[in-house]
Each structure stands twice: as structure tokens, then as C-alpha cells.
Amino acid sequence: MNSKHPPGTADAPPGATLYAMRRDPISFFMGLARDYGDMVRFRLGDHPHDLFFVSHPDSVRDVLVTQDRSFSKWFSVERIREVLGDGLFVSEGEIHLRQRRLAQPFFHRERIASYAEQMSALAIRLRERWQDGAVVDICREMNWLAMMIVGSTLFGTNVEIDAAEIRDALSEILDQFERSILPQADREDFAKALGRLDTAVYRIIQERRATGEDRGDLLSMLLLAQDEDDGGRMSDLQVRDEAMTIFLAGHETSANALSWCWYLLAQHPEVEVRFHAEVDEALKGRAPRMDDTPRLPLTGRIFAEALRLYPPLWVVGRRALEDIEIGGYPIAKGSVVIISSYVTQHDARWFPEPERFDPERWTAEARAARPKFSYFPFSAGSRACLGEAFAGMEGVLCLAALAQKWRLRVVPGHPIALQPQLTLRARHGIKMTLAARADSPPVA
């Protein structure tokens, strides 16, 4: 083990480092990797310990998988707990394991297959309400679609009545995650948005609890789950925390990924032509099904490449619970290790011309030639996103269903900028013009 510290900016004024990170966090972390290499040491504001930024796939594996028991989560816990309570995203240790075991069956392949029909039906419903020549913010459209899918599949509930309220409240809440210290006015806005979100979620919980109905979905499981020690049921607050976590993770990440897919396809018409040809040949005008996914390989590669370029879960932090070693350097107990899928997935060593959109990076041969942890848009290890397979199928089916009738073009002059919050959003949305496809087969 190297007894020395890794290179970095630890001697720079901590306030200057904090300012640089807040101003443009993606450029900040990309700059650390570019200027100092695979492991960087820095200080941040008045944080009492060193922080380390690691970007090499081997170190990513060590932090997320091989040495994950030596770390706890690190983030603005207080703010996230205000929104998600003690749900799966925030909890640690045995509580986290129990919550994960409780939810896991609803993300097994067999269960996910049963959601395919609802995913396709909702995508078709969206495409039928679109109008030729209309301008839409594709981020809002994909947000609605992903929200309806999570509500229908995991919660057995039509959330359309609350969709706009939930979307706007979540946007306000996520905006506040960009700041670590909120002025009072912002905190008041945050509290109001959280209140609106709670009202919608509690309404869904109370309506289902009143019926006592077991629909075999995730919400029923949460309401009927019994404590291993005393046999008691979850309180509305406990159900709310779990439901809020899964609802946020289940729709926010998918909505962002789908939005970036449409943007990338519009920028690369040569890929779009091949994409439309694949969809037309595989589906011949009918609704996409689960068993169509093997016949839509390019569609899957497009989704994977969008997740590489714009990973929704773009950064994670871990706090060392003991003295350990990562990348050949000592990490003291209490230190924080930060990993960014965005940075690693834009590393030219693993992805030549990393800014270029190239779905062919996802052929079996290309994947086998790269380190496993050069790509981790859903994190990895014991805290990997449970919904990875759910999101993958949702992405393929929704892209295919919408592309059967439409092609989309970015409105000229519309600004495209990243907004790195808890997830990676488009700061100004993505305004796109809908164009009905004249070359598609008749759609059933």
C-alpha cells in the first residue's frame, strides 16, 4: 500500500473547492479526473475529513462491491430524509436488507414480464394523444409516461389525477437538492412542495387501505407486510416512506433516460433510420410485447448508450466506516469516497470518443472488451438499483411503441444544458416538434 496520499487539491482553499463544485459539479469532477488521475484527494468547505474522488473501474468495484461493508451512504441525509423518510434509499444495515428483501420479488424477471402489457398500453395512449406538428417538452411527456407506468404496475393505481401535482412538486424538491444550505424562502417552498407530494401519496395509501384489497402489487405488499418481531403492520408513515422511495426512483430515472434517447435520436438521423426500420420489421404495426425485446437489439443499445452519456444516477458518495485501502492508497475512517458514473462512462480509455453517441458500443463483443465497472448507471453491489431490469424493458417497449408513429426533432435554438441534481435532468427541458411518420406500416 502506498503510504502517501493521492494527488489532488487538498491544499487549495476549501471554500474555493466548494464554490467550484456547486457552480458546475460535472465539470468539477471531470476536471479532477483529467488533471489528477484515477484517484484524487480534496477538501470541501468545513467538512472535517478528506474526500476522495475515484473513477477507475477497479476502484469503483472495490467501493461498491468488494469492500461495500466498509462504507455507509453519504449525501445530504437530512434533506433526502425529509422527502424519502427511512425508505430503501436512505436506510442502512439490517433495516436496509429487510426492506430490500421485501421489495425484491416485485422486480424479478417473471414479475417484470407481467408489466409489459401495461407499459405498452400507456405508451400507445400517449402517442395517440400527440398531434402532428405540435411542440412538446419531451421531458414532461416522458415524466407523465413513467409516472403512469410506476403507478399502474407497482401500485395498481391510476395516478393521472395527481400526475401534474406530483410532477411539479418533485421538480421543486429536486431543484432544492442543488443547494446544501437553503435560504428560508427556499426552505418554505421546499416544505410546501413536500406537503403537496405527501397529500397525493397519502391519498393513494388511504384509499387502498380502506378497501383492504390485496391486488398482488407492491403497494399491497407494503400494506400487508408484517413485522418479523411483533407481527404488526406498517404504519401509514412507513408505507409512505417506502412508496415515496420506489415511486421517485421508479419514474424519475426512466423519464430522464427516455428523454435523452429522443434527443440523441434527433441529433443522429442515421441511427434513427435504422431504429425505425428495426421497430417496423419486428412489430409490423402491432403493440410491442415482452417477447419482442430480443428482436429489438438496436433499440436496447440506444437505451444503453443514452444511459452511458446521461446516467440518471450520476454520482454516489460513501463514508468509510473503518480505515481501508482503495486504489493502493489509505482511506481513513470517516473519509468520504465519491464515484461518478458520468465521469467513468466518459473516460476515453473505456469509451473512445466518449462524447460521441454510438449504440454499437453495446454489441456483445464491445462489452466484453471493457472492464465490467466502466459502466454502472444503476450503481452496483448491495445498493444497486432494484429496478434496473424494469427500466431496461420499459425503455425498449416505450421507445418502440412511440417510434411506430412518430419522429421527433429538437426545436431550433432550444438550449440543451445538464442539470445535475439528485438525478441528471435537462435544465431547460427538451422542446421537440412531433412529426408523424409517413413511412411506417399501419399501426393497430
Question: Which stretches of residues belong to each language-model region?
Answer:
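N-terminal membrane-proximal hinge/A-helix region immediately C-terminal to the signal-anchor transmembrane segment
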Residues: 1-94, 98, 113, 117-125, ...
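Cytochrome P450 heme-thiolate monooxygenase catalytic core
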Residues: 1-9, 72-83, 91, 95, ...
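Cytochrome P450 proximal C-terminal region
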Residues: 6, 33-34, 123, 166-171, ...
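Cytochrome P450 I-helix active-site segment
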Residues: 6-16, 116-120, 168-172, 187, ...
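Proline-centered turn/helix-capping motifs that create local helix->coil transitions or kinks
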Residues: 158-159, 204-216, 270, 310-315, ...
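Cytochrome P450 catalytic-core helices
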Residues: 253-278, 389-404
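Conserved cytochrome P450 K-helix/beta-meander segment immediately N-terminal to the heme-binding cysteine loop
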Residues: 339-366
